[in-house]
Amino acid sequence: MTTSAPLSWLRPVPGSPGDSPHRAPGNTPDNPAGNTPGSTPDPLLIVVGGVPGAGKSTLLARIADDVPGSVVLDPDRYRRGFARRLPSWVPYAAYRWAVHTLHAAVTLLYLLRGPRSGAPLLVHDTATRERRRESLGLLARSRGWDPVLVAVDVSLDDALDGQLDRGRVVRPEEFVRHWERWTAQRSALADLDGGPRGPWSGVYLMARCDAFRPVRELARRRLPAGDPRR
């Protein structure tokens, strides 16, 4: 694969994207907050993070299909809506700001109004900006959600290939910033081993190829009691 010059100096992330973190006792993908049996947990918020091209939208689309009781917020939905309504010659770059502004506004609305049905809420976010990520978790917890972070782990080449496969490539300088923040945080996230950090009940580092099953089961188990889709 050929990459542009501004990306050539990016360093690889230490460690293997396929590493499976050890889970902290009592704090598993099925029980991120370590709730005791018989307790009623808060409705779950799952933030699916990762650099552009990590496969967040693909993972969320699979969850939406497989766990119909869940609520999934993904900017790709708004992108498709704009694309259907705009002339085909209008490039995505021309309305990308509108897509992400709308996604941010809808996400904020869902978090602020708090849980309504008890169904799990899954949100797309790069989650590479630490302050933004922590603010998101704090807001969610203050409004009655049980926030969990799932960071989708990919190699540099896989992230770049993922952007090419989807047909939307982030500007090189923007991707550089995402990747540098990711490399600075990855080891700390992996060391959490699924344990809590700040407002997050659980922080999980998952290889892209391994993420679907645990995230699906996590979402299913947090559907309201009696829901036949559990």
Predicted regions and their residues:
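The conserved Walker
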Residues: 51-52
